[in-house]
Amino acid sequence: MTKLILALAGASALALAAPVVVAAHEAHGAGMDEAHIRDTAAFMKMHGEQLSAAINHPSRAADKARDPFRHPAETLAFFHVGPHMKVGEYAPGGGWYSRLLGHYLGGEGQLVGLFANPLAATTDPARQQRIRDQAAGFGAEVAGFTGLPAARFSAITLDNLEGHKGTFDRILVIRALHNIMRAGIADTEIRAMRELLKDDGLIGIVQHRAKADAPWSYANGSKGYLKQQDVIDFMRLNGFELVAASEVNANPRDSADHPEGVWEMPPVLSTKREDLKALGESDRMTLLFKKAK
């Protein structure tokens, strides 16, 4: 394994808990090219201070306990998420990243929650409406997290792309790809996201990683884990090319073979296994894709 440590410039290096660590992981067949490494270093010189301020905002006091395992500064730097960008967060869920992104983008950028196409996700009208209601309430929810006006934030469902196509700089899919894989809607959801991206837009994926030799029955999303090469191939089939891969969210201590799936690992600890409590969170791939031409 080769590793490159990019020290944050100036005050950012003091404010963040750890330097940006980017690694190529030959065992998974993908790494960072030198151009992306240089670009990431330049990105941190330009935006590191603003990113640091968002990560260390007092409203994230409770969230920071997960920072050593989720590496938000390193992850957003690797994805080159700038504070001026229009960024879509797919399946925002509990708001851990929304709180950070709200502060980081709320001044000059745009944070848009991206919610599943309700018509594809379920045939139950009540559940469809619930998805639409979640999207409608996203702006107020992030405003509550950040103290910023709700008008600075918005959300859409992926059956409502008109007026939004080709306008997003970045889309983030954080620990969510397995859910749409097992629901059978991954292809249509990813293709909708592709329509939202600008020609030079990028999509960043963080996903629980199965072992390369894991059986399909374990690595099909039902246990929360996916194989890295399967994700790369899936994205290629849906019109994307891999830009770079990072090991910043890797955890070799995770055996990724838990009978009840990734939820046995912290922070969920669904089976309360004592031997898993000290292992950190799951082993994760961190992948960056561009639109294929």
Language model features: what each stretch is:
Residues E49-F78, G82:
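Class I SAM-dependent methyltransferase Rossmann-like catalytic core
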Residues P83-G93:
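Conserved class I S-adenosyl-L-methionine
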Residues G102-H103, A186-D199:
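A short glycine-rich, Lys/Arg-flanked "PGG" loop and its adjoining helix->strand segment in the class I
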Residues A126-N160:
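S-adenosyl-L-methionine
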Residues L158, N179-A192:
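A short, conserved alpha-helix within the catalytic core of class I
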Residues L161-I171:
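A short acidic, Gly/Pro-enriched loop at the edge of an enzyme's catalytic core
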Residues D200-H208:
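Conserved beta-strand signature within the Rossmann-like core of class I S-adenosyl-L-methionine
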Residues S255-K293:
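Core SAM-dependent methyltransferase catalytic element
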